[in-house]
């Protein structure tokens, strides 16, 4: 009986292992498909599954910026206001203050002027606290605005809202320029401040990295969601209208989460997850690699095992059938369990899923499932990065330039197995020689610091 139950469970794991396999040849295919989709998205609007949004950021901060700059980070039920004092190459960020403010629920579905009025009044209070040290000499204060909702950007400091996501539904803001709305609200507060850049958090990650390291060419977010932005040559963007920027460069926000390709290793669990999601058929790459979904994929595998095998004993499946009850931090803790009897795995299974009295053999199987799902995610993320590097001719044999990738997000920062797998996969795909010139760096707070730095790099007072 026991042997049959174990064999049935092992069959499920063996099938998962095979379906999630990411040999180098397959990952090379993913990288090539990513580079191809990128080129198609740059050629024309709507030319690709990935949007390849022109950010209008043509200068990245390089450490020489000076002065006091502000940032507003709006992306969820809270927003953040931030103030940074920059003192050039030698001292960099000399002071940094921030404040987080909760948005009252009624404002998230009210009207536009109420929401932006509330934000502007919080900004005005924050500015009032800056003390006597701030010398503006009749200069306007400048702000970088991180707005983490879909926008059709029309210039560095203007963009119309395409639609709200998360818990927001303010109909009269859709189709309006969010910068103009904020600017108007600030004027009503008597606040003399100019929005000098509208960005998204991934562009901010690239900027925050680039401020400390001028070799950074790609910014990636690997957290609850996933995205990448990178520095492209402006003359390689056929859809870019008007004259090319003086710098010759343009930051592109890829929106790579929506990438999909026949090269991707997709299982029955991924297909079911996608079908039951709020956006079926969309964000396929993100659903394979981001922190929002890894725990949920593992839960679905465990549920199948419980249906095909009695390995978990006499189990009430209520918890195991609850979507998203297993989060990525939970699988990370199980994956990193170093106790000889995998005690932490036993505790997690009991606490989260009411799976009790597991054998050591069963717990090892659970760790293996976490490993299979996480390795696939990390290796696919690495292949995506290699696709971007190849698109811009970096990290290829003969290229001696140093290329650094700035990565932000809890999945990369806190999930050690994920991070190590991503880094070794990069080396494997780039090859020993080329990988010597490619490095990965953690870059924190693109949405706050990054926005303030882009405001500084695009200040109206620069010569």
UniProtKB/Swiss-Prot annotation:
It comes from the Eukaryota. It is found in: Cytoplasm. Keywords: ATP-binding, Cytoplasm, Glycolysis, Kinase, Nucleotide-binding, Transferase. One of its GO terms (cellular component) is mitochondrion. Changing residue 76 to D: Abolishes glucose phosphorylation activity. Induction: Down-regulated by glucose or fructose treatment in leaves and immature seeds. GO terms for molecular function: ATP binding; D-glucose binding; fructokinase activity; glucokinase activity. Expressed in roots, leaves, flowers, immature seeds and seed coat. It holds the Pfam family Hexokinase_2. Its main location: cytoplasm. Residues 200-445 are annotated as: Hexokinase large subdomain. Signal peptide: none annotated. Residues 7-456 form the Hexokinase domain. ADP binds at residues 76-78, 224, 410. GO terms for biological process: glucose 6-phosphate metabolic process; glucose metabolic process; glycolytic process; intracellular glucose homeostasis. Fructose and glucose phosphorylating enzyme. Functions in sugar signaling via a glycolysis-dependent manner under aerobic conditions, but its signaling role is suppressed when oxygen is deficient. This is Hexokinase-7. It comes from Oryza sativa subsp. japonica (Rice). The lineage of its organism: Eukaryota, Viridiplantae, Streptophyta, Embryophyta, Tracheophyta.
């Amino acid at each position: 009986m026991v042997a049959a139950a174990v064999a049935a469970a092992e069959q499920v794991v063996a099938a998962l292992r095979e379906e999630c396999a990411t040999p180098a040849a397959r990952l090379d295919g993913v990288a090539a498909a990513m580079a191809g989709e990128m080129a198609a998205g740059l050629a024309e609007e709507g030319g690709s599954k990935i949007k390849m949004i022109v950010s209008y950021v043509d200068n990245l901060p390089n450490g020489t910026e000076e002065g006091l700059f502000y940032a507003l980070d709006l992306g969820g039920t809270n927003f953040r206001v931030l103030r940074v004092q920059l003192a050039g190459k030698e001292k960099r960020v000399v002071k940094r203050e921030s404040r987080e403010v909760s948005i009252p629920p009624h404002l998230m579905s009210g009207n536009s002027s109420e929401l932006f009025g509330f934000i502007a009044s919080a900004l005005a209070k924050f500015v009032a606290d800056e003390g006597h040290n701030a010398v503006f000499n009749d200069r306007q204060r400048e702000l970088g605005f991180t707005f983490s909702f879909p926008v059709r950007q029309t210039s560095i400091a203007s963009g119309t809202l395409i639609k709200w996501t998360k818990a927001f539904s303010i109909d009269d803001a859709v189709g309006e320029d969010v910068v103009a709305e904020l600017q108007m609200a600030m004027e009503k507060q008597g606040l003399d401040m100019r929005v000098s850049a509208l960005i998204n958090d991934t562009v901010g990650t690239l900027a925050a990295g680039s401020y400390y390291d001028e070799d950074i060419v790609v910014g990636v977010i690997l957290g609850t969601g996933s995205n990448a932005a990178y520095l492209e040559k402006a003359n390689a963007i056929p859809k870019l209208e008007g004259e090319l920027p003086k710098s010759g460069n343009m930051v592109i926000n890829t929106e790579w989460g929506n990438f999909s390709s026949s090269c991707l290793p997709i299982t029955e669990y991924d297909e079911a997850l996608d079908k039951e999601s709020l956006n079926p058929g969309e964000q396929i790459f993100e659903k394979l690699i981001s922190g929002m979904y890894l725990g949920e994929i593992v839960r679905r595998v465990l549920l199948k095992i419980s249906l095909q095998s009695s390995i978990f004993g006499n189990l009430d499946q209520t918890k195991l059938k609850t979507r998203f009850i297993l989060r990525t931090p939970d699988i990370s803790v199980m994956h990193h369990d170093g106790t000889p009897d995998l005690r932490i795995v036993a505790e997690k299974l009991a606490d989260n899923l009411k799976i009790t009295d597991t054998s050591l053999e069963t717990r090892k199987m659970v760790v293996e499932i976490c490993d299979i799902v996480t390795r696939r995610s990390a290796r696919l993320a690495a292949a995506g990065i290699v696709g971007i590097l190849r698109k811009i001719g970096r990290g290829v044999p003969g290229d001696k330039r140093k290329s650094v990738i700035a990565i932000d997000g809890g999945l990369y920062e806190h999930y050690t197995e994920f991070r190590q797998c991503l880094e070794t996969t990069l080396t494997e795909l780039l090859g020993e020689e080329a990988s010597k010139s490619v490095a990965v760096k953690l870059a924190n707070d693109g949405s706050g610091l990054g926005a303030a730095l882009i405001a500084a790099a695009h200040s109206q007072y620069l010569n």
